[in-house]
Swiss-Prot record:
Belongs to the beta-defensin family. This is Beta-defensin 105A. The gene is DEFB105A. Pfam families: Defensin_beta_2. Keywords: Antibiotic, Antimicrobial, Defensin, Disulfide bond, Secreted, Signal. Residues 1-27 form the signal peptide. Disulfide bonds join C43-C74, C53-C67, C57-C73. GO terms for biological process: defense response to bacterium; innate immune response. It is found in: Secreted. InterPro entries: Beta_defensin_dom.
Amino acid sequence: MALIRKTFYFLFAVFFVLVQLPSECQAGLDFSQPFPSDEFAVCESCKLGRGKCRKECLENEKPDGNCRLNFLCCRERI
């Protein structure tokens, strides 16, 4: 009986650890690395690829929403 209880606790602990691991869906654009030119990959909230996520927009760009914390979606001025 004690062996069954220990096995149950072991499997429960393994399950708990596996649940804490991040899922594959979190490994997307939100965690992308910056490019050498200090630009980030295009965010989903950045109008379907028509802008770039940056801390500050360039002179020829205008802010058009937020990508994530402290980043703006910058689009070219028309």
